[in-house]
Amino acid sequence: MRREAAAISPITGIVSAIRAGEIVILVDDEQRENEGDLVFAADFVTPEKINFLAKHGRGLICMPVTEAHAQRLGLRPMVEQNRSRHGTNFTTSIEAAEGISTGISAQDRALTIKVAAAPDAKPEDIVQPGHVFPLVAQPGGVLVRAGHTEACCDLARLAGLSPAAVLCEIMRDDGGMARLPDLIDFAAQHKLKIGAIADLIEHRSRNESLVQRVSERDIETTWGSFHLVSYRDLALGSIHLALVQGRPSPQAEILVRVHEPLSVVDLLDAGPGTHAWGVGEALEAIGQAGTGVMVLLNCTQTSEALEARLAETRTPRGGRGMDLRLYGIGAQILRDLGVGRMRLMAAPRKMPSMVGFGLEVTGYAELPKR
């Protein structure tokens, strides 16, 4: 463990390396993909770098870009419904419209990335399909989704470069995915720095926020007295609410429920086809425990959103999936409220990493039997 911790460079060092055009290794949390990617800023793409990724990384060479840049290029999702395990946002693959031979060579892929990453790039500059795979980062970066795609764009932006990058997963000689012990040896062999996405989240969380606390007051509910705190989503302008009972502290394990999307339907429909935990059930459990937090996301609902919610067919409890963007929003709210260790009132599921936010999921509360 000491060897692994010592091998991770501080984020300031990783940003400096990206700014200098170096290749770095970026690792995510072991509870997520648990992999390392070779990463460099798209502004510094060369055939030599692409060849290094293909020869030593062995994974799929992709090009993370921001949503704004993807729209500028007219990139469309690879599939209409993204059902991948981690919600990786692939678009249809691309090729430079001119100057390409087969498209797969290091020279051709470097040219495609150079053309597509240009600040003034337009749809006519590329053709589809091709041999380079763009990935679209979520707005808000790693504060919204703790993925390599978002981390790449964040690092390029922090380095003062175009928010586009190149990445490639690192595989072992036997074809398996390289894990941190393998990556440490790989980094030493090729003299590369290793950075952790969790550290990038922590770095950005200290300096940036996606939410702003706007008001708070005490309220009386059917389930007891709560402190109501409202937050404004700085990206979308929507309102999120938090109902707090007791005094959360980073060291104490408390009950937490993050509920999305909040609709009048969620307050009225207590049947078995709604969320894993209903609003009333969660507030009742917090009231009995004496300490806990209930976060209600997207409390600003348009008539169109309400119509869509009313039209939804019932799904089994726990069948609703949360928008990946909202994990980061919920995490920032919980951190602002002083939460550290939390037992979730939710159906057990594979979740994005919360490590960079200073949050630990200790387990899942069992829904009381009726």
Where are these regions (language model features)?
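Catalytic domains of riboflavin
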Residues: M1-R370
